[in-house]
Structures are given as C-alpha cells and as structure tokens.
Design a protein with these regions (language model features):
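Catalytic cores of glycan-processing enzymes that make or break glycosidic bonds
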Residues: 1-64, 71, 77, 220-228, ...
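Structured, charged N-terminal subsegments at the starts of enzyme catalytic cores
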Residues: 4-181, 185
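Generic structural hydrophobic/aromatic packing signal, biased to beta-strands
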Residues: 53, 60, 80, 92, ...
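Structural signal for hydrophobic packing residues in well-ordered secondary-structure cores
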Residues: 57-64, 77-81, 107, 133-136, ...
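Alpha-helical scaffolding segments of alpha/beta enzyme cores, especially the outer helices
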Residues: 75, 127-134, 156, 160-167, ...
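Acidic, glycine-enriched catalytic cores built around paired aspartates
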Residues: 86, 91-93, 98-100, 110-117, ...
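Short, solvent-exposed polar/charged micro-motifs at secondary-structure junctions
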Residues: 156-159, 191-192, 268-271, 508-516
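Catalytic or ion-translocation cores adjacent to nucleophile or general acid/base/metal-coordination motifs
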Residues: 168-346
Length: 550
C-alpha cells in the first residue's frame, strides 16, 4: 500500500498485473530525484533504497518467482549494501604535527583571528573537517568518516583531531561523526602502539564510537616509513610484532579490530605478492578481514585488465580466508615462537648495520649526489612533495617514495635489502636460516622479496652512479653489503643466481634489463653533467635531459 501511494503518472499507466515493474519505475524516479536533490521525492539514505529493493524481493519470493527474486535483483541489493550512494568512501589523512600546530595557532590568534591572522595551514585543516561534514550531510556517514593521523605518537594526537573537528563548526549539530585512525609508522611508534591505544580508548569520543559500532576499531600500520627509519629487516619484524601485540590487546578489550596495512608497490614499501603477505600475518590480526593500500604505481598492473583484477582479488580473498583458519593460525604462532631467538639476533645486527650507514658523516648529501633524488623532487608528478612540508630539511623528513625510487633508479634497491647480509653473517647458522625459510611464512616471504630486489640490482651500473659521489667509504659499505646479502640469500633459498627457480619472473627481468641498462647509462651521463654545471642556462638544459631519462 505504501509503495502504491508513491506511483508516478508514468508508473500508474502500467497494468496492475505489472506491479513490480511499476514499483521499480517509482524507485528509478526517486533515484533521479536523489541525484537532483529533490527533497520531496529523493531517498534520504541508501538504507531506504535497500529497504524498497528488499520489499520487491520478498514480494517476488512470496509469488514463487524465486529466480527473479534472487537473481539480478539480489546482485543489485548486494551492490547497494556495498557501495551505497557514494560508491567509494573518502578517507582523510593528515600529519599529527599539522594538527598540533593548528591548535597552537588558534590558541594564539583566536578561532576567527581575533588576535592576528591564522596561518594558511590552519585554515586548510579546519576546511578539511568542513569538507568532511559536507560529504556526510549529502551522502551519509558511510561516505566519509575515517580520519587517519600520520605519525601518531600519543593519545594526545587523537584528542587534537576531535578538538579541531569541533572548532571547525559554529553549531554542535553540524559537527560530523568521525572515526579517528592512528597510524603507527616509525620503529619507536610501533613499539609504543599498545600503550597509545590503551590511552586512546579512554577518550570520550572514542568510547562513544566503540559503543555505537559494536566495538569496531581500525588501526593503521605504515610499512614505508618504518623501513626507512629502521631498515627492511627490523621494520618487517617490528611490524609483525606490533600486529601480534595489537591483536592480543584488542581481544583482551573485546574490540573488533581491523588492521589497515599501508603497504604495497616496491618491496621497500612493504610490496610483494599480496596473497603471501596475508598468509604471513600473525594470529588474530586478520579474522577474515584484510585492508591495505594499493600504491599508484601498481594499480594499473593489478586492475587495468579485468581478468587480472579478478585473479588478484580472488587470490587475496582466498589467502584472507585461509589465514583465518585455526590450523594456519596455529602454524604461524608456533613458527613465530620457534624462530623468535633467530629473529631477535637478525633484527639487532641488521638494524645496527643500517643505522651505521645512515649515521655516516655526509650520508645525506652523498645520497642526493649519487641518485636522482633532487631531480625526482623537481618532477611535476605524484600526489605529494618529496619532503614533508614541516620546515625541517633532514633525511628524516624525506618521504619514503623518493627514498625508495632514488635507489631503484640507481639500480641498487638498497631500501629493500640493506643490513640482511651482515645479520646473516653474524648469525652464522645456515641450517636454521634454511629451516626458517621452509617453515615460517613471514621469513620465506621476506627472503623471496629480497631475492627479487637483488635480481633487479646491477652492480656494474650501480658503480657508475656511486662514482658521482666521490666517497669511497660509503661506496664500499653499499657494495660490500650488496655482495654479502646476495651470497646469504642465495644460500638460504638454494639458488645459484637470483630467481633461478622462479623462471617467469627471472626471464621477465632478464629480457627487460638491456633496455633499462641503456636508460641508466644515459641518465648517469646526464646526472654527471648536472653535478658539474654552474651556468644557469646549461643547468636548465641538463635538468631537462635528466627529466626525460627519469
């Protein structure tokens, strides 16, 4: 009866024997009204639209038209439940320091600039919350509610976001509902993550959201910055340990946890086969859910072809379900305990070796000289600048993308492997390393990814780039570690050369290498010219050549 009262003139012309068709026409009109923002006819939420679809479905089922009820109509219901009216949720993200500086600015100058002009960044932060509120008002809370805090250091960072969200609006009823997601990125932050979360759940706004969502909570882990901060070996082990501790903490508080993995793309950014990454997760950290970022440089490779896209999604979904099986969880738990001592020793040695390189006097300018780091920063590509715009100019403020890509351009790929060779050499027990490779998914995935990175390095060409820096001591550290890591990885996997037993990938790299070699040599010549230029016109011409080869 309620449906029939909504019939438009067009639907009313349809025979009463085609009631379902008439109702669907009404729904189509209401969808158009929703797009046009016609308040009288529009759907005010996707839930109302889904309710209408289910009414039609029940009616068809009761009429014994089950093929119609549970065929394409069921697909439409699933699509509506999955995508809503907004298609894809908009997630927001900002650095914790930006929030704290915005609050300091407001306290000093007043919310409306009563005691002086607010900084442009403060206006941008407040406008971000207003944009979030506008999206929610138009498309519902599911369209935009997650707010990620990069470089979360303490629970105060979470409080800052809730305070700014309130300050952005004049009327309390306009303040949008948000779920604040801490992002732990650096080694120290990963180690302190549980302490921060313990304080976080004491915040009233967080408690209210936990109650409203049935205890759902999301925590994000950063693979890129942790790798740049601690080195690939220590970052891998620290992330695994953090996930394990966070999962246990969530279980103890009856929290329905989703871990959001900021990984993908290059191996130095946590990349590699996604399905194997899922299977290597610690017990309790998946529970049939796995959320991760897809980096821009791999989106087309994974989703550009529908067949490949379906295969990739199916592979990750299968791994997610398999990893949640009790037998797999038990295996991962047992292997983590069995090789804990080995992991600890590798971690310490690799971390020390990595820090020794980074702390060598003059490393930062040398790195800028022997790689196209500066030129990458000048390219008008990418969604973010090469360095974080927080005023500092140290290596710490260099974003991970140019850090990793610069080493890749120099055919060194240092960000993926540096320190492991020394760690294995000091550990010395090849049998245990081989056994761990066979039994422990985390270690085997890590070693296989490093072997792939080593297959893409070229010592001959790397030496040409390193010669640009005139630092034999640093060159020796890099080349010695490259050789040592290659030796130990090949021993562990039982290969005579990288990717010997992964024929397809190995052949693909070998076919591509001659073409990349030519580009690399040309780029080295351009960089050599750039490093010597003083005249502005000549410098500009050399830069243009460098951009072309990049």
């Amino acid at each position: 009866k309620e449906m029939s009262e909504r019939l438009t003139d067009k639907a009313a012309l349809i025979s009463t024997k085609e009631l379902h068709r008439a109702v669907m026409l009404v729904m189509a009109d209401r969808l158009k009204a929703t797009i046009d923002r016609d308040a009288d006819l529009m759907y005010h939420s996707c839930e109302d639209y889904i309710a209408d679809l289910k009414t039609v479905q029940r009616s068809l089922a009761e009429a014994n038209a089950k093929r119609s009820a549970y065929g394409p109509l069921q697909d439409l219901i699933w699509q509506a439940e999955t995508f809503g009216f907004h298609m894809v949720e908009m997630e927001f993200r900002q650095h914790s320091v930006v929030h704290s500086r915005a609050l300091e600015d407001i306290r000093e100058h007043g919310l409306h600039g009563e005691r002086g002009e607010l900084q442009p960044m403060t206006h941008e932060v407040l406008d971000t919350f207003r944009a979030l509120g506008s999206i929610q008002k138009r498309n519902g809370i599911k369209a935009a509610r997650r707010y990620i805090i990069s470089f979360t250091k303490s629970a105060q960072n979470i409080k800052d976001v809730y305070e700014l969200n309130r300050l952005a609006f004049s009327h309390p009823e306009d303040v949008p509902t948000i779920d604040v997601i801490p992002l732990f990125e650096q080694l120290e932050d990963l180690q302190n993550s549980v302490d921060v979360l313990e304080e976080m759940i004491k915040i009233p706004e967080v408690q209210a959201r936990l109650k409203a969502t049935g205890g759902k909570m999301e925590v994000m882990l950063g693979y890129s910055d942790s790798s740049k901060d601690a080195g690939p070996t220590s970052a891998t082990l620290a992330l695994h340990s953090a996930q394990e501790r966070i999962a246990k903490w969530a279980e103890s508080h009856d929290i329905d946890l989703t871990l959001f993995h900021g990984r993908g793309g290059a191996v130095g950014r946590g990349g590699g086969p996604a399905n194997r990454a899922v299977l290597a997760q610690p017990v309790g950290s998946v529970k049939c859910r796995f959320k991760l970022t897809e980096q821009g440089e791999v989106i087309f490779a994974r989703y550009g072809n529908p067949v490949l896209a379906i295969r990739h999604v199916e592979s990750v979904a299968a791994a997610t379900l398999l990893q949640s099986a009790p037998s797999v969880e038990k295996r991962n738990t047992d292997m983590t305990k069995k090789y804990a001592d080995m992991a600890s020793k590798l971690d310490e040695a690799a971390h020390n070796r990595f820090l020794d390189l980074l702390n060598t006097d003059g490393f930062a300018p040398w790195f800028s000289t022997v790689t196209p780091l500066t030129e990458i920063g000048l390219l008008p590509i990418g969604s973010r600048p090469a360095k974080r715009g927080l005023g500092a100019k140290s290596l710490d403020d260099l974003r991970t993308i140019p850090w990793i890509f610069s080493w890749a351009q120099a055919r060194i790929n240092l960000a993926a492997w540096y320190g492991l060779g020394t760690a294995c050499e000091q550990f010395g027990d090849l049998n245990t390393l081989r056994q761990a490779y066979e039994e422990w998914p985390l270690f085997s995935t890590f070693i296989d990814n490093i072997e792939m990175s080593l297959a893409k390095t070229d010592e001959r060409i790397a030496k040409m780039y390193l010669a640009l820096g005139d630092r034999e001591d640093l060159n020796k550290k890099v080349l010695d570690e490259m050789e040592l890591t290659r030796k130990w990885v090949l021993k562990i996997v039982g290969d005579e050369w990288p990717l010997q037993h992964r024929h397809v990938l190995g052949q693909a790299i070998r076919i591509r290498s001659p073409y990349v070699d030519a580009l690399s040599v040309t780029q080295v010549l351009a960089l050599r010219s750039l490093r010597k230029k003083v005249d502005k016109e000549e410098l500009s011409q050399s830069q243009q050549a460098g951009f072309i080869y990049l």
